[in-house]
Amino acid sequence: MNFVTVIGLGESGYANLLKIIPALNPDMGGAICVMVLDSSDHVESFVKYLDAICDFEVTIGQNGTTLEGGSCYIFSASDQVLLSPYSGHYTFKVRSSEKIDNSESIDDLMVSTASLLKNRVAGVLLSGSQTDGSKGLEMILSEGGSSYILNPEYCLHKTMTSGPFVRYNLQGGLDETKLASVIQQCHYANKENVITA
């Protein structure tokens, strides 16, 4: 795997994501992992629609799924998702349970990905009414990766993006089109650098 972008959003971020994922070229290499802080039913319906309009393969991430380039994996907040090494590859460890504290679902996915892939990770936060994702962005930055947020002006709910925007002095002013462009640039820049688990 050469590069992974982890995107976090709340239930108010679907419209933002619809402007980003379809704009990406699967030839850019690497994978996209998305954590949506919404119910699994809503996320599954959204994934079916997004897969139909994208060049990327868009799927619901499952436990044991091997991370593959040119794919977009989407998870709901009812899952605790960690990326882990397995037999020279990276796989998802997904634990679904109503008893899991899902207040840090985005953080968990970002932190586990950054700890494995170091500077080959970008973290992105979109619209959301929750504060999840801030710790994940911090970990990605500390490992040498890149972190971006959607300009709060483009967010229906600004809580998820406004805190990190101030705290980490992140590159602001990015709308969905610019975010898609930055994500592609990160992936293309690392396309030839493959890392194994």
Language-model features: locations:
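Conserved acid/base catalytic micro-environments in cytosolic active-site loops
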Residues: M1-A197
